[in-house]
């Protein structure tokens, strides 16, 4: 122990006496370890972290896919359930202590605290079964949790609020428990606050603000409630395994229950059964561990995190190579000192241990600095990844596993890249080292040093090429033709109370909104729609074309659709390329009409004019419902990375009266619009207050969720790609800088070692230009070898990322050419100063020194 302390004190003295070396080494390590730890922090928080609940390993989800919100016939792997089906499955699973159900897609509701809120707030609420909090083993931070007695239609309406919302929206009001809130205009009693750190069973960027009992959904959603007869599939289910029980046999028992239910008891329309029944034997249930909750962000960000992990791992390798080169150069510079100590009787093992201690100390100090870089870096990454989100339920603070990872990484770095320099330094022969201590004719950089510089150049090219590909892909995404205009367009997300308007009242409300907004001085036109392009929403439906029979119940036959007002297409800038748009003649008393996009026209009406043709939703019974009057230009509504889906549009002013209960319910629900679109003129920066006031004057109960420009709405779709591209670009620049530092150090060291040789050359007639060429040739030879190795590696890395690239090849010559030029320019900048110093050598002084 005493010897170890002596070695540590000696290492600290050595580092203190070489501040430039120490600072460079620590900065290099801090960047490499910090960036890698930051990515590991986010990976652990998003991909690996368990829910903050009791014994999460005992939780299992029934089903393992993520559906949108309702229905669920598209997948054989069944994951979405109606309330009666959930009850049937729960009863057939005795291995579970209890099974809870919860809403797959929590919605936005108008929520106001009695006597304290002047205006309602647009907050997200999730319906849960009465045993939800009990299954997760959670108590309330204040008050009590929702229980089974609350989950009754006859019970008094209650709600729980999240700890985050209680703090941020209600100022941690200690008297909030027991107060009255109005949800969609209905009074409820707030009975409790959820524990800190619990954001629901799904890790998402918009977690619930409130939780409501499942069976009270009918109170708030009225005629649109999912709990009414003809139940749709809209719930997820999670069960808690009994101690000692196993889930292995459970899927085989639950699958027949599901199939019997779908065949005999599911309240699907009779005319739909002939198409559905043949697919029932293919339906099955799978159970998956649910300790991490329902995967949402895991699915969304998994690929990006893997790319960033590879990028940071590469950056760490470059940083380690730089550190090893610094240690090798430092060991070579101390050859004479090492020789003296060996001549005086110092043991080689002691010298190795001392230099290894110095490397380990550097690594530990660099790791501590890296934790600071990791904390800041993780916060920066969260800000970039969730730029459009108001809240992110992910902690940027490194957890204990992350701290252990950083510590282990630091030690590993010190051992791997400290052993070789220490061993090489200890091999010095005292007589040889002392004889050449003052000579300037040493051979120069060693082979390991050259290999490290070549490795840095190769890996830097890989990072630069990857960053270039990701940046070019992002540019292609943002500059593509979306099929609509974003300039001077504004979107407003609204939430009209579902049970407050009859269809007649809705028509009057919509006319008042359009007329009131158009009267504003900076508004040229206004329209309404169920949802606007690239807003994260999608309505899907099967369609049947007149004369072609029933559609099959597969996703491939599904299309998207929207319900829009007459001015919609001109307001958003989506052109009608054939036929006409909606007009005054398309009223509630005229024949139902539709406009289809080019993709739907190509798919269902190839080689014929779709205008004048008829189609309907769901099945052939309704195939003559809508007459196509126009074809709209293809536009991207769902995924900007994919081609436009087939899509049709229905006029907001028309309704169809269906004999089928489910179809009629959908018809009513889709008349509640969620989006207003505006075409503005002039400066729109100060328009939001005017818009809010105008809408409040029309209907004070109309909840406004967001007001943003169309360009902002579109840009929010690329937050993840932007984060990856910006971080990869930053890491690529850092890698190039580290490679330049390594090349500069090696070139300067080589020049210092060859001072006498340079003096001899100049004495024999070599001019300064020849000396500069000599030095640059040696430096560029190393870089050229690095490029030869790095180009195939970069091509391979591009192929690994191909799925993340948009309209760019994984070996794009422009990107690769720019990366090579950038690395070459950096190498030239790193080599020119040592070359200039070599050319400025005084031959007499150099020879006299020798």
What kind of feature is each model-predicted range?
Residues 1-21, 53, 78, 107, ...:
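Membrane-helix entry/capping segments
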Residues 1-22, 293-297, 326-353, 357, ...:
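Alpha-helical transmembrane segments of integral membrane proteins
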Residues 19-46, 50, 319-320, 363-367, ...:
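Short, strongly hydrophobic transmembrane alpha-helices
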Residues 39-42, 286, 324, 360-430, ...:
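Small-residue-rich transmembrane alpha-helices
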Residues 43-58, 67-70, 206-211, 215-223, ...:
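Short juxtamembrane loops and helix-capping segments at transmembrane helix boundaries
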Residues 51-106, 236, 268, 477, ...:
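Membrane-proximal extracellular/periplasmic loop immediately following the first transmembrane helix
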Residues 124-148, 156-303, 379-383, 466, ...:
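Mid-to-C-terminal secondary-structure elements
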Residues 319-363, 741-780, 787, 834-837, ...:
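Interfacial "coupling" helices/loops that link adjacent transmembrane helices in transporter permeases
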């Amino acid at each position: 122990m005493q010897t170890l302390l002596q070695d540590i004190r000696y290492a600290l003295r050595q580092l203190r006496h070489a501040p430039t070396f120490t600072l460079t080494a620590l900065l290099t390590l801090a960047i490499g370890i910090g960036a890698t730890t930051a990515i590991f922090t986010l990976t652990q928080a998003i991909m690996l972290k368990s829910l903050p609940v009791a014994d999460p390993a005992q939780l299992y989800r029934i089903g393992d896919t993520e559906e949108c919100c309702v229905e669920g016939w598209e997948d054989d792997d069944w994951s979405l359930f109606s309330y009666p089906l959930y009850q049937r499955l729960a009863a057939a699973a005795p291995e579970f202590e209890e099974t809870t159900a919860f809403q797959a897609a929590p919605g936005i509701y108008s929520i106001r605290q009695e006597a304290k809120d002047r205006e309602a707030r647009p907050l997200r609420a999730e319906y849960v079964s009465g045993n939800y909090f009990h299954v997760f083993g959670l108590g309330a931070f204040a008050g009590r949790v929702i229980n089974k007695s609350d989950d009754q239609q006859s019970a008094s309406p209650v709600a729980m609020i999240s700890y985050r919302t209680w703090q941020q929206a209600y100022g941690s009001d200690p008297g909030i428990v027991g107060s009255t809130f109005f949800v969609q205009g209905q009074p409820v009693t707030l009975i409790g606050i959820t524990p800190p750190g619990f954001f629901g069973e799904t890790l998402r960027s918009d977690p619930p603000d409130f939780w409501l009992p499942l069976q009270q959904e009918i109170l708030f959603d009225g005629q649109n409630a999912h709990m009414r007869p003809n139940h749709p599939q809209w719930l997820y289910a999670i069960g808690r395994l009994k101690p000692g029980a196993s889930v292995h046999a459970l899927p085989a028992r639950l699958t027949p229950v599901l199939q019997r239910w779908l065949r005999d008891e599911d309240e699907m329309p009779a005319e739909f059964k002939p198409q559905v029944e043949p697919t029932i034997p293919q339906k099955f249930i799978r159970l998956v561990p649910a300790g991490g909750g329902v995967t949402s962000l895991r699915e969304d960000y998994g690929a990006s995190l893997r790319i960033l992990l590879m990028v940071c791992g590469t950056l760490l390798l470059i940083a380690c190579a730089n550190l090893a080169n610094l240690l090798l150069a430092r060991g070579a510079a101390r050859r004479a000192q090492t020789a003296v100590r060996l001549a005086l009787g110092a043991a080689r093992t002691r010298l190795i241990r001392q230099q290894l201690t110095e490397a380990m100390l550097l690594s530990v100090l660099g790791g501590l600095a890296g934790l600071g870089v990791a904390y800041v870096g993780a916060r920066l990454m969260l800000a970039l990844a969730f730029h459009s989100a108001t809240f992110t339920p992910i902690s940027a603070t490194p957890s204990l596993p992350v701290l252990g990872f950083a510590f282990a990484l630091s030690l590993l770095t010190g051992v791997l890249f400290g052993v070789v320099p220490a061993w090489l330094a200890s091999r010095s022969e005292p007589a040889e080292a002392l004889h050449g201590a003052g000579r300037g004719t040493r051979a120069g950089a060693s082979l390991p040093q050259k290999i490290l510089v070549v490795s840095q150049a190769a890996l830097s090219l890989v990072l630069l090429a990857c960053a270039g590909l990701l940046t070019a892909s992002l540019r292609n995404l943002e500059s593509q033709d979306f099929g609509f205009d974003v300039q001077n367009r504004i979107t407003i997300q609204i939430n009209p109370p579902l049970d407050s308007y009859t269809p007649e009242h809705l028509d009057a409300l919509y006319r008042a909104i359009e007329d009131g907004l158009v009267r504003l001085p900076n508004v040229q036109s206004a329209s309404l729609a169920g949802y606007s392009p690239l807003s994260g929403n999608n309505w899907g439906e099967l369609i049947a074309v007149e004369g072609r029979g029933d559609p099959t119940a597969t996703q491939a036959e599904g299309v998207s659709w929207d319900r829009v007002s007459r001015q919609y297409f001109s307001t958003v800038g989506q052109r009608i390329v054939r036929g006409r748009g909606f007009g005054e003649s398309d009223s509630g008393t005229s024949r139902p009409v539709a406009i289809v996009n080019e993709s739907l026209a190509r798919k269902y009406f190839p080689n014929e004019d779709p205008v004048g043709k008829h189609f309907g939703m769901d099945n052939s019974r309704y195939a003559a419902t809508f007459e196509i009057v126009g074809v709209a230009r293809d536009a991207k509504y769902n995924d900007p990375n994919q081609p436009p889906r087939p899509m049709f549009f229905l006029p907001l002013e028309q309704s169809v009266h269906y004999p089928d209960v489910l179809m009629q319910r959908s018809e009513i629900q889709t008349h509640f619009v969620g989006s207003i679109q505006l075409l503005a003129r002039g400066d729109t920066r100060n328009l939001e207050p005017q818009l809010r006031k105008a809408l409040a004057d029309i209907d004070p109960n109309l909840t406004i969720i967001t007001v943003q420009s169309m360009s902002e709405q579109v840009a929010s779709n690329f937050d993840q790609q932007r984060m990856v591209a910006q971080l990869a670009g930053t890491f690529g620049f850092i890698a190039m800088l580290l490679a330049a530092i390594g090349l500069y150090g090696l070139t300067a060291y080589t020049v210092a070692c060859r001072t006498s040789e340079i003096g001899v050359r100049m004495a024999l007639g070599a001019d300064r230009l020849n000396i500069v060429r000599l030095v640059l040739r040696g430096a560029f030879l190393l870089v050229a070898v690095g490029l030869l190795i790095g180009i195939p590696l970069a091509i391979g890395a591009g192929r690994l990322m191909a799925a993340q690239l948009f309209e760019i090849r994984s070996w794009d010559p422009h990107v690769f050419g720019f990366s090579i030029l950038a690395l070459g320019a950096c190498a030239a900048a790193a080599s020119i100063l040592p070359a200039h110093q070599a050319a400025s050598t005084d031959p007499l002084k150099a020879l006299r020194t020798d």
